[in-house]
A protein has these predicted regions:
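Nucleic-acid substrate recognition interfaces
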Residues: 1-369
Length: 369
């Protein structure tokens, strides 16, 4: 194939992208062959939708005459020429306000929803907090279906400094209303002409995930948290039952990934704990809870106490993090002594908030002795 007057830097970028795709395919194929799996063989995908990079000085220049403009080198069908384009004023103000002085990479062309955009990337080095475990303040987060997120600010001794219920009911109502329209349309006309409606519902769900992640990170920063603790929700499997659509739309991994990016930029760390029995076990150690049949957010403990199930789970999430971090650096003899006095901390899937309070008390007594 001949590419008339194609710049050498664009040609090199295309060649490197192709080599990277081939190398990735070979690596994935070797790993697949080692596992002896019958299905899921990697495929060499040719349509990678690679977009060109506008290298600075040779393809991209900032416009000296217009504050919110730029000059791009484009091919007009005959020759490569410089064209002046106007950029969004609000976007450029955001970049000038938040990313001035940071190391900027070359902008990349991006196509979304049949429109083209310039994606600007910046590099920033942020030191993460190194606060000792006993001095840490954490924000334990329970992501749920009924309430979007329940956050608890906690110290290592179990002291609760703050609690917050994060929910966006109007956004969820809007999305479910769109899903209802899709369902009614599909019953009448089939599923052939609802692609745009599903795309709209997906965008609403993505925006909901952004708002939840921003609210969680903002609350953690407001309370000077060192670590944001989540449940490990990377499990995969077939989903069935009445709540199948709700579970498919639940963007738990996307929310955690967005929180991780935002927290790292603010200097906070992210940690995950085992999710087993965090909601099933009561935080006070009384045993399993019984959820209300009409309102799954509320539950009854074995001792008759009525409580919010998601709030109890957020206590247990924070407790499991501190139990793990407090026991990890101890010598084996000291750890065995503490586990003998608090047997429930041996199995992490059965640890609750009451076990953290008891463990911390035993550690203080052992240190005093």
């Amino acid at each position: 194939l001949r590419f008339p007057k194609m710049p050498s830097y664009l040609r090199r970028a295309a060649i490197q992208h192709a080599l990277g795709s081939i190398s990735s395919y070979k690596t994935r194929l070797e790993l697949w062959e080692k596992t002896d799996q019958k299905g899921g063989r990697p495929k060499l995908v040719c349509d990678n939708h690679a977009m060109p990079v506008f290298y600075r000085d040779v393809m991209y220049r900032e416009d000296t005459e217009e504050k919110d403009g730029a000059c791009l080198k484009l091919y007009d069908g005959h020759d490569w020429k410089w064209f002046r384009v106007s950029l969004s004023h609000t976007d450029m103000e955001y970049l000038r306000k938040n990313w001035a002085g940071k190391k900027a990479a070359a902008p990349v062309l991006e196509k979304r929803h049949r429109k083209y955009f310039l994606r600007f990337s910046y590099t920033e080095e942020v030191p993460l907090t190194k606060t000792p475990v006993k001095e840490q303040i954490i924000c334990s987060v329970d992501l749920g279906l009924n309430t979007d997120a329940v956050c608890t600010i906690m110290r290592s001794d179990g002291t609760v400094l703050g609690r917050k219920f994060i929910d966006f009911p109007s956004e969820k109502d809007r999305m479910y209303r769109v899903l209802g329209r899709i369902s009614r349309f599909q019953r009448k006309h089939g599923s052939a002409q609802v692609k745009s409606r599903w795309a709209y519902a997906k965008r609403l769900n993505t925006e909901l995930g952004r708002k939840i992640a921003g609210a969680v990170t903002g609350y953690a920063e407001e309370n000077h948290a060192d670590v944001i603790v989540f449940e490990y929700l990377e499990t995969k499997g077939k989903i069935s039952g009445r709540k199948k659509q709700k579970l498919h739309l639940w963007r738990k991994r996307d929310i955690q990934k967005r929180c991780e990016h935002q927290a790292h930029r603010r200097g906070m760390r992210i940690s995950r704990i085992c999710a087993w029995n965090t909601s099933r076990l009561a935080y006070d150690g009384s045993g399993t809870v019984v959820r209300d049949p009409g309102n799954h957010s509320l539950c009854t403990f074995q001792n008759g106490k009525r409580y919010n199930c998601d709030l109890s789970a957020s206590y247990n999430i924070g407790a499991r993090y501190f139990i793990r971090e407090l026991l990890k650096p101890l010598p084996v003899t000291e750890r065995s002594l503490l586990e003998a006095k608090v047997p429930s901390v041996k199995r992490r899937i059965s640890c609750v908030y009451a076990d953290l309070r008891e463990l911390f008390s035993e550690m203080e007594l052992l240190r005093a002795a």
